[in-house]
Swiss-Prot record:
PANTHER family: 2-C-METHYL-D-ERYTHRITOL 2,4-CYCLODIPHOSPHATE SYNTHASE, CHLOROPLASTIC. InterPro entries: IspD (IPR001228), IspD/F (IPR026596), IspD/TarI (IPR034683), ISPD_synthase_CS (IPR018294), MECDP_synthase (IPR003526), MECDP_synthase_CS (IPR020555), MECDP_synthase_sf (IPR036571), Nucleotide-diphossugar_trans (IPR029044). The record marks R27, K36, H281, T380 as: Transition state stabilizer. 4-CDP-2-C-methyl-D-erythritol 2-phosphate binds at D255, V256, H257, H281, S282, D303, I304, G305, T379, T380, N381, E382, F386, R389. Residues 1-248 are annotated as: 2-C-methyl-D-erythritol 4-phosphate cytidylyltransferase. This is Bifunctional enzyme IspD/IspF. One of its GO terms (biological process) is isopentenyl diphosphate biosynthetic process, methylerythritol 4-phosphate pathway. Keywords: Isoprene biosynthesis, Lyase, Metal-binding, Multifunctional enzyme, Nucleotidyltransferase, Transferase. Coiled coil: none annotated. Pfam families: IspD, YgbB. Bifunctional enzyme that catalyzes the formation of 4-diphosphocytidyl-2-C-methyl-D-erythritol from CTP and 2-C-methyl-D-erythritol 4-phosphate (MEP) (IspD), and catalyzes the conversion of 4-diphosphocytidyl-2-C-methyl-D-erythritol 2-phosphate (CDP-ME2P) to 2-C-methyl-D-erythritol 2,4-cyclodiphosphate (ME-CPP) with a corresponding release of cytidine 5-monophosphate (CMP) (IspF).
């Protein structure tokens, strides 16, 4: 059967994908950032860059990302965006088993084709993805590979050269390796059933089960990050590619709410016992309201009242988490990354200190950023003005966001 055109593939079915990212990356050494798939290259986690290549491809539907059971927090930090077509799968003790579990997670959907990719190949390009899918048929899988160009030597046990190996017909395999879904799942299940764990890639399992695999030209850019030096070179490459003055934007927000009878206030999404509550159309979370305005300001996107007018009854009593997550979504959709948020609460009471850790964590969860990028401070008004008279609470917020591109001249 001949390879299909991209248009034909799009009409017939979107391919699914399995991104395998459950390894420990021991050869890359230890890092405070975690295993190598979570290390930063060009200020972005390796896995986040890898995943984006697949979410950006219109020919790919559901994506199963297979991660280690201990890595859920690392994943949320690396990939704060929520993608409707991405599912998280807990991996197994080996890459082969993690791949099988990723394939099983797609079983109810039963896609026509599936691409299986290493999570630490972050430079996979759209052209290669499209060529792989275009060459898939129900009768064959596709393996991107590069013809071996270096002279190959076989060494004896003592390290001395034993013989030279012909390069003719030899290729270095890459990923994603793509297959008709049902046959490759069946092959993995058969290997699992007899405890065969010695396959070095998915194409080898396909060969074992006599699934035809077509080799197409891979990409020299599509390198696998194995060693610490690979990660260093990848980071250097990206920084050189983007050696321009970054588009760093800062937004400010201010809000104030008065007290009324009640038994708690809500600040940064955390309920704090108090002798009064804040008066407002929503939950009156003065901190989140100020921060929402600050984030919107980095896009010139108006203020909280523009997006959630107090005249609209649907926002009566609403949790302000809705507002801040909406603002963060606007930032992300523009390619922005939140570098830092700073909130200052101005109040005589209640005391903020005992609740600062919970408030910080709440903001981390809402914005998908690390705790060292969140600052929450409190001060009194030295008994001056409405704050000094304990009539309400004010908040000032600042957000710093990095957007793609450079500052225009």
């Amino acid at each position: 059967m001949q390879a299909q055109s991209l248009a034909e593939v799009t009409v017939i079915s979107k391919a699914a994908a399995v991104i395998v990212a459950a390894g420990r990356g021991e050869r890359a050494g230890q890092s405070a950032e975690g295993p190598k798939q979570y290390r930063l290259i060009g200020a972005e986690a390796v896995l986040a860059r890898t995943l984006r290549a697949f979410t950006d491809c219109p020919l790919i539907g559901t994506i199963a990302v297979v991660i280690h059971p201990d890595d859920h927090a690392l994943y949320r930090r690396a990939v704060p965006e929520k993608h409707e077509n991405v599912i998280l799968v807990t991996g197994g003790p080996t890459r082969q088993e993690s791949t099988r579990l990723g394939l099983l997670a797609l079983k109810d959907e039963a896609p026509q084709y599936v691409l299986i990719h290493d999570g630490v190949r972050p430079f996979i390009g759209q052209d290669l993805l499209e060529r792989i899918i275009a060459n898939l048929t129900p009768d064959n899988g596709v393996l991107p590979a590069l013809a071996v160009s270096d002279t190959l030597k076989r060494a004896a046990a003592d390290g001395m050269v034993e013989t030279t190996i012909s390069r003719t017909g030899l290729f270095a395999a890459q990923t994603p390796q793509a297959f008709p879904y049902a046959p490759i799942l069946d092959a993995h299940e058969k290997a699992f059933a007899i405890n065969r764990t010695d396959f070095t890639d998915d194409a080898a399992i396909a060969e074992w089960q006599e699934i035809a695999v077509r080799i197409i030209e891979g990409s020299a850019d599509n390198t696998k990050l194995t060693w610490a030096k690979d990660i260093e070179m990848a980071d250097k490459r990206l920084r050189q590619d983007h050696a321009v003055f970054p588009d760093i934007r800062t937004g400010n927000g201010y809000d104030v709410h008065s007290f009324e009878p009640g038994d708690h206030v809500t600040l940064c999404g955390v309920k704090i016992p108090h002798e009064a509550k804040l008066n407002g159309h929503s939950d009156a979370d003065v901190a989140l309201h100020a921060l929402t305005d600050a984030l919107l300001a980095t896009r010139g996107a108006g203020d909280i009242g523009t997006h959630f007018p107090p005249s609209d009854p649907q926002w009566k009593g609403a949790a302000s988490r809705i507002f801040i997550e909406h603002a963060a979504k606007i930032v992300r959709e523009a390619g922005g990354r939140i570098a830092n948020v700073d909130v200052t609460l101005i109040s005589e009471a209640p005391k903020i200190g005992p609740h600062r850790a919970a408030m910080t964590q709440a903001l981390c969860d809402m914005l998908g950023i690390a705790a060292d990028r969140v600052s929450i401070k409190a001060t009194t008004n030295e008994k001056l003005g409405f704050v000094g008279r304990r009539e309400g609470i004010a908040a000032i917020a600042t957000a710093t966001v990095i957007y793609p591109g450079e500052v225009p001249e």
